[in-house]
């Protein structure tokens, strides 16, 4: 099962990914949390570019796609194949939103990611940019060049407009506990279908 958590910076993706993983592991489900860009060579190169000189949007797309292909081949597909729950803190919709906000065609970006397995549930944590930026400052970080009100507004608009069948929008202006409860309920809906009668005990524990 593949769970992707998306949203603009400051939406609470990392917090939710950790909370969901803790809950799922607690009821005996093998769960892996990963992120994009990854800590692999391509993801590392992308982060280094912020210091050594930014890539162009087209170059960033190339590096992101290389990073994602490796991620899919080395972790996502193998772990799903063994029956694990894979939780991703950002996935291909982030590239579509952020590079789309930089002016690249959204349809072309989606097509370039056709190789990436589609999530069973895509949790879009929706917050206004002003709240996302406030949270970034509150956690002691300094917003990067992507993290401006104007740019995050464009990204948010693209996230909300994306037509992906598994997308579920969660109001992430609420507190972390409320967001977690909403997300867990959506994940349980998918697990109920996936596990069937055999998963009754697991679902009962998750609901407890």
Swiss-Prot record:
Belongs to the thymidylate kinase family. One of its GO terms (cellular component) is cytosol. The keyword Nucleotide-binding applies. The gene is tmk. It catalyses: dTMP + ATP = dTDP + ADP. Its EC number is 2.7.4.9. GO terms for molecular function: ATP binding; dTMP kinase activity. InterPro entries: P-loop_NTPase (IPR027417), Thymidylate_kin-like_dom (IPR039430), Thymidylate_kinase (IPR018094). Keywords: ATP-binding, Kinase, Nucleotide biosynthesis, Nucleotide-binding, Transferase. One of its GO terms (biological process) is dTDP biosynthetic process. HAMAP family: Thymidylate_kinase (MF_00165). It comes from the Bacteria. Phosphorylation of dTMP to form dTDP in both de novo and salvage pathways of dTTP synthesis. ATP binds at residues 7-14. This is Thymidylate kinase. It comes from Xylella fastidiosa (strain Temecula1 / ATCC 700964). Disulfide bonds: none annotated.
């Amino acid at each position: 099962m593949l769970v992707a958590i998306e949203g603009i910076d400051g939406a609470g993706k990392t917090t939710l990914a950790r909370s969901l993983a803790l809950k799922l592991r607690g009821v005996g489900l093998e769960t892996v949390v990963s992120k994009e860009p990854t800590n692999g060579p391509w993801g590392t190169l992308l982060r280094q570019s912020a210091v050594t000189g930014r890539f162009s949007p087209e170059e960033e797309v190339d590096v992101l796609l290389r990073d994602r292909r490796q991620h899919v081949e080395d972790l996502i597909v193998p772990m799903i194949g063994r029956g694990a729950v894979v939780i991703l803190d950002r996935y291909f919709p982030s590239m579509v939103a952020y590079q789309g906000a930089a002016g690249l065609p959204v349809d072309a970006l989606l097509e370039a990611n056709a190789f990436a397995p589609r999530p069973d549930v895509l949790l879009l944590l929706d917050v206004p940019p002003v709240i996302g930026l406030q949270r970034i400052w509150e956690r002691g970080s300094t917003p990067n060049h992507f993290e401006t009100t104007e740019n995050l507004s464009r990204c948010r608009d693209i996230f909300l407009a994306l037509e992906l069948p598994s997308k579920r929008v969660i109001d992430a202006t609420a507190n972390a506990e409320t967001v977690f409860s909403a997300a867990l309920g959506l994940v349980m809906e998918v697990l109920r279908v996936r596990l069937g009668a055999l998963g009754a005990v697991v679902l009962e524990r998750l609901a407890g």
